[in-house]
Amino acid sequence: MNMLAPTAKNAFTPASLDRPAYQSGFGNEFSTEALPGALPHGQNSPQKAPYGLYAEQISGTAFTAPRAHNRRSWLYRIRPGAVHLPFEAMAQGRFHSHFNEVPPSPNQLRWDPLPAPAAGTDFIDGIVTFAGNGGPDAQTGCGIHLYAANADMTDRFFYNADGELLIVPQQGRLRLLTEMGVVDVEPLEIAVIPRGVRFRVELPDGDARGYICENFGALFRLPDLGVIGSNGLANPRDFLTPHAWYEDREGAFELVAKFQGSLWTAKIGHSPLDVVAWHGNLAPYKYDLRLFNTIGSISYDHPDPSIFLVLQSPSATPGVDTIDFVIFPPRWLAAENTFRPPWFHRNVASEFMGLIQGVYDAKAEGFVPGGASLHNCMSGHGPDADTFEKASNSDTTKPHKVDATMAFMFETPAVIRPTRFAAESAQLQAKYFECWQGLKKHFDPSKR
């Protein structure tokens, strides 16, 4: 029996999977129930929970983490999360956390989009690990993956014990049915699923493609705004967390876990998406990138790309993040006497980029939606020859709008190491370096 239950926030109101309901705010202390009175009053773990439910806490940080950074939620579910048969190791596929398969290269790298997968490929089977650093054992670094899928996960569920998942759809919508509610996400939106939260994925459009950043380190948070002030960039109110929803199904199901870089499988006799109510501040959320409040120069020069920071995973070093998630959205460029595209750069950090739609303003061609690029530590990069010539001779007395585009970047202080699949992929563009070879010598010591 598939039970589509009503949800509640302060008041009990019915809801439908046709239109999932959300709660607004980033990192808020939420309370939501899919049956009236399912949340215990005044305590977390009563002797007997309402409706015969089990109380279970899921912790995303240490018990003793400072209150401002402590993340946990209490779940009230039909069966505890421990109810399943033992896990067995799966054969290693293309989704993993093994980043020492091949030596990393200082070359600039760029890939075409993944080809369409074989029929019947669900979201988990469609994930391909492209690169990463650090590892889940040390709880630092990230895994970078691409996915291409064409089948729903109906009787299969997944959770990631290694890190939280930042999902960036590029083509096709995703319906993320999680323990804590339903999240619908489309291209130009992102979703984050916390470490350990179980879910399955449906594909409303039949096919889907996109990117994933797997965060092994500290949870993603909003960056401090400093002198920008109290508003700007990604505003907290625009992050949406689902209301409680559950399904009460029994059958022969599979639970897949990612643990210490490898996949494991277990048989489970019921759907683990059976949380009838929950409260806390650790939960899935989504964000519409089109709502990003872009900051830029209105006088001269192109500011550092940190002005486009959406989410960060902080490290122990002040001012240095384990991962920065940055976007390059539609925006007006108004700086006068300025080379307006992103400038030439050699960076101590490493940059993995993807393109959701349109054209990236530093690359006239070759970098296409669904593709990716990697510029590792101190690898020179920047606008291609065509972009440089055009921008160097454009009229900067008039504002110009970069429109119908959305590129993004996962930036890390550690070198991003491609996997064997990525290094040997047919999608790797062997002639990427040629985009800079047409840059001409303009130097003339007799002219200033």
Swiss-Prot record:
Fe cation binds at H345, E351, H381. It is an enzyme of class 1 (oxidoreductase). It holds the Pfam family HgmA_N. The keyword Oxidoreductase applies. This is Homogentisate 1,2-dioxygenase. Its EC number is 1.13.11.5. Homogentisate binds at Y360, H381. The active site is at H302 (proton acceptor). NCBIfam families: hmgA. It catalyses: homogentisate + O2 = 4-maleylacetoacetate + H(+). It comes from Ralstonia pickettii (strain 12J). Its cofactor is Fe cation. Belongs to the homogentisate dioxygenase family. Keywords: Dioxygenase, Iron, Metal-binding, Oxidoreductase, Phenylalanine catabolism, Tyrosine catabolism. Hexamer; dimer of trimers. One of its GO terms (molecular function) is iron ion binding. GO terms for cellular component: cytoplasm. The gene is hmgA. Pathway: Amino-acid degradation; L-phenylalanine degradation; acetoacetate and fumarate from L-phenylalanine: step 4/6. Involved in the catabolism of homogentisate (2,5-dihydroxyphenylacetate or 2,5-OH-PhAc), a central intermediate in the degradation of phenylalanine and tyrosine. Catalyzes the oxidative ring cleavage of the aromatic ring of homogentisate to yield maleylacetoacetate. InterPro entries: HgmA_C, HgmA_N, Homogentis_dOase, Homogentis_dOase_bac, RmlC-like_jellyroll, RmlC_Cupin_sf. One of its GO terms (biological process) is tyrosine catabolic process.
